[in-house]
Amino acid sequence: MSNLKEQKIFDNDYKSAKFIGIKGHWSNDVLITHDNKLIQIIKLSGFSFETADDEDLDIKKDLRNSMFKGVGDSNAKIYTHIIRRKKVPYSPGYVNPDMPYGFPSYLDKKWIARSSQKESFINEIYISLIYKNSFIKNPVTEIQNQFLKKKSDNTAFLQAMHETHESLLEVSSRVMSSLRDYSPEILSIEKVDELYYSRPAEFISDIVNGIDERKIIYTTDDLSKHIVNSRLIFKKKYIEIKQHDGSSKFASIVSIKEYGPKTWAGILDNFLKMPFEFVISQSYDSINRQIAMSKMQLQQNRMIQSEDKAISQVVEISEALDRAMSGEIGFGQHHLSVMCIEENLKSLENAVSMALVEVSSTGGMSVREKVNMEPTFWGQIPGNFHYLGRKSTINTSNLASFNSFHNYPLGKAHGNFWGDAVTVLDTTSGTPYYFNFHLRDIGHTTIIGPTGAGKTVLMNFLSAQAQKFRCRLFFFDKDRGAEIFLRAINGKYTIVDPGKQCGFNPLLLPDTGENRIFLLEWLKQLVSVLGEPISAEDVALLTSAINGNYKLDPKNRKLSNIAPFLGLEGPGTLAGRLAMWHSNGSHARIFDNDEDVIDFSQANVFGFEMAELLKDKFSLSPVLLYLFHRISISLDGSPTMIVLDEAWALIDNPVFAPKIKDWLKVLRKLNTFIVFATQSVEDASKSAISDTLIQQTATQIFLPNLKATSVYRTAFLLTEREHHLIKTIDPGSRFFLVKQGIDAVVARVDLSGMNDVINVLSGRADTVLILESVIKEYGDDPEVWIPIFNQKLKESQNKTTE
């Protein structure tokens, strides 16, 4: 405090730069202060705690305790910060130029407008490591240092600084390793468009200028002068931060005055969803363990002698002493402050009230800074320990509780495998979640949800948002739930019904080695649907039939014309087993056709209704073999997604199960991923392919299920907390659980009030009938039929309610 008085801190016209204390960059990723401290700043994405079990959180707390103790033993000092800033997912007026015209663009604009109306925040976590130049710790040495610095040869000073730098990097390396689960990143100078910017300086600028999000160009000049971008006016209870454009922000600071008797992992987690911007600053300066233990013993003796009734505190001190004597914990001087930031004074008062309550909920006593406000403000800057007035001794286990480094995942907005994020989802914390199917280059995804949970709407919404990538889409539908949507995005929709003409003819495939291999597998499947074995002689006959097929004129290539190659029909013969598939056979209308209706060059989107096919155990595998083969040979490396509704019913069979693992790898190499969806977790749990899908899928989505059994945990390796969330989330809220890598988040697609969009994304038997009548009368141009469809649906609903 005396330092500030000497510099006339209450003169509102003073130059703020002198209090920052940052001289410049010692190296690309290390700052140096005016008193020769070195600082390295590490940014953390944080640990996804919302769905983690308490046991896991406690384990991570113990690991952080060990890390903090190690840092303290190395004589490094620590600052940590949480910066909660407003984040608009989309800039004002943003229109995605890559979204196809029509329904995808219409939906995208409405979703962007909805997302832009909501006040969103993100949490940024930082840990700063501060190392003092050992060469100037000793007063005598400091005099020598000043003398050396005045001489042209300052070798001793530089050597001392080099050693300090090496010590800092050694500590930093250990911290980076300890915090690997928190996705650490060292802030450094970065090059953008031929200019160099200082990210460490930008971090400090956020603290000083009330979270201003500006770029700071790297300079060899005094960096403090370039950090200040606002005029700071310190009032009695608040700070006015005047911006260059004439606008102002207002800030007040809440601190811990007295600490509570206990701490726990995630003690500050509620701050992570507060509806205002803030900067939480903490500092930790280790002290001698023996001195700390002596103070604790003295405090304990006083409590005992005064017959203090707080027996639990006496016991806790004994436990802490035991842990200290065993070297399990260290001690240090700690401060914690919360700078609340708002755009007007009324909102600021509300924010301060919430912060006071939340700090008090830790079990301690909170205070709003007034006289001590300005020193605390400058004390937020890493290295400015001398400005801090409210410091108390805590142990490293307490420090690990106050610094859980928990966070809500943000996903990844840019630089994903396909580019920008697929879409932005709402979350329970008010932070946006940038959703991607891909984690690195793996995009395979599972979506699990019971009937009525919103699975169809979610699948179709995500598929619609993915159209920005101009990707090809192959959608295997059930009960025509996606038909309206697929037709709305100009898709070709085919109802695959074994009892009707399907228009498939695999024998018209071009004569290639790959197609010949497929035809042999396909024919083998046709002649063994009743479980008959395939002999070597059978394989030879089938191969002969394939050879014969390609000797025929293309117009004659069909099943009924190659059947004679298999010999005479009779019970149990190869020709007899093929008879059901051609001519007058029970399933002849599927494959024995003069032409093949499949032409994947006609469009980018194709839908196949599979409900009737799923009822026919004979036809399912041969038809899927053909469709998947046609899709596979059409893949050329352009972005492609395949959606399998009721995936387990489609592919969990002896034909596909053995090859699913290799198939997924091949698709990945061809820039293609699959979305596996199902409503029956029990069926999935009994499946031979579930283990493979869990290992090969990057993203898992679980919709609420009030009847979720323990099968969820065993089949999909969920934590107890994740299982609990799935069971307790209100299905009407449209929230769901997204798991990707080590991250998990509760998110939702809120389409309330967008009935015209929901009508398209969610097909039902009655709405599909309306669609059929509208298309029959007005044609299949979505621009024409969608408005008419919505109007007729509205009229139908009005009649129902009358």
Where are these regions (language model features)?
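Short beta-strand-centered segment that lines the nucleotide-binding/catalytic pocket of NTP-utilizing
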Residues: 471-483, 497-498
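Hydrophobic positions on the alpha1 helix immediately C-terminal to the Walker A/P-loop
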Residues: 458
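Extended, folded cores of ATP/NTP-driven motor/assembly subunits in large transport
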Residues: 1-410
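A short helix-turn-beta junction within AAA+ P-loop NTPase domains corresponding to the substrate/partner-engaging
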Residues: 491-493, 689-702
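Conserved lysine of the Walker
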Residues: 455
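The conserved Walker
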Residues: 439, 451
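Hydrophobic anchor at the beta1->P-loop junction of P-loop NTPases
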Residues: 447
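P-loop NTPase motor domains
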Residues: 47, 54-72, 269-270, 364-365, ...
